[in-house]
Amino acid sequence: MKSFVFALALIVAFACISESKSDHTGYEEEENLEDSELTDLVAAALLEELAEASEMDDLSYTEEAGGERMDKLEEMALKLKDKLKTMAEKGAQMGEKLKEMLPKAMEKLKELMEKMKNKMG
């Protein structure tokens, strides 16, 4: 049980890290901040739910209580799966945008190199 909660917490942490790394793509800073803040809020909410689920003070060790905890953990896992799917879709969209931007960037780089070459030689 505790290892399952710990594993979910690690997944949330990795999801937050991967989301923060994707923020450095050159898109509008305001959009990135909103996505980052949303991801942080979702991660905080999931971690809070995990912490609540792991507290055993007011729950007995009956089969029913264990089943309720497992149901809650399954629900949180599904939420996390949906969030990761959304993040993957956003990543794919950003990848497509980068593919579109790359030829333009390469062309500008060639132009700059040509200008420098003409100035030097």
Swiss-Prot record:
**Role summary:** Shows no antimicrobial activity against Gram-positive bacterium B.subtilis B-501 or Gram-negative bacterium E.coli DH5-alpha at concentrations up to 20 ug/ml. Shows no toxicity towards insect (S.carnaria) larvae.
**Signal peptide from the UniProt entry:** 1-22
The name this protein carries in UniProt is Met-lysine-1b
UniProt-annotated location(s): Secreted
Q: Which UniProt keywords are present, listed alphabetically?
A: Amidation, Secreted, Signal
Propeptide part(s) removed at maturation, as residue ranges: 23-69
Listed GO cellular component terms?
extracellular region
Please list the residues that carry the modification Methionine amide.
Answer: 120
